[in-house]
Regions:
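Extended, small-residue-rich solenoid/repeat segments and analogous flexible loops
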Residues: 1-10
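Soluble cytosolic regulatory domains appended to membrane proteins
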Residues: 6, 19-32
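A mid-sequence, solvent-exposed acidic-amphipathic segment
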Residues: 12-13, 34
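Short low-complexity stretches enriched in small and charged residues
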Residues: 13-14, 46
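Right-handed parallel beta-helix/beta-solenoid
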Residues: 15-16, 42
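Intrinsically disordered, low-complexity boundary segments flanking structured domains
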Residues: 18-19, 81
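Glycine-rich hexapeptide-repeat left-handed beta-helix
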Residues: 26-103
């Protein structure tokens, strides 16, 4: 976790698999997972969140996701495992998809 990161009441599991860039804000009740159980097997994969991102309240970031610098993940959005969010994009929904590019 780099300097200037603000984390509200997030749940971050598997800290050794999670990187969060400078100036990112993680909203309350957001969940960031480096692992999950799938079909009786454990899946482990790193999560990389870039600089100056915003992860909304109650969003869920699953294993293997990468979020580019300045991207926004809307409140309650769920990123499926191994999702790549390019820099500067806004994603939302369940499952999350691109809504628009940030201004």
């Amino acid at each position: 976790i780099e300097k200037g990161v603000r984390i509200n009441t997030a749940r971050i599991w598997d800290m050794s698999l999670i990187s969060i860039g400078k100036g990112t804000v993680i909203g309350g009740r957001a969940v960031i997972l480096g692992h999950l159980a799938e079909k009786g097997e454990m899946v482990f994969a790193p999560v990389k969140i870039g600089k100056k991102c915003l992860i909304g309240t109650s969003a869920q970031i699953n294993p293997g996701c990468t979020i580019g610098d300045g991207a926004v993940i809307a409140s309650r959005a769920v990123l499926k495992k191994y999702t790549h969010v390019p820099a500067g994009e806004i994603w939302g929904g369940i499952p999350a998809k691109k809504i628009k590019e940030s201004d």
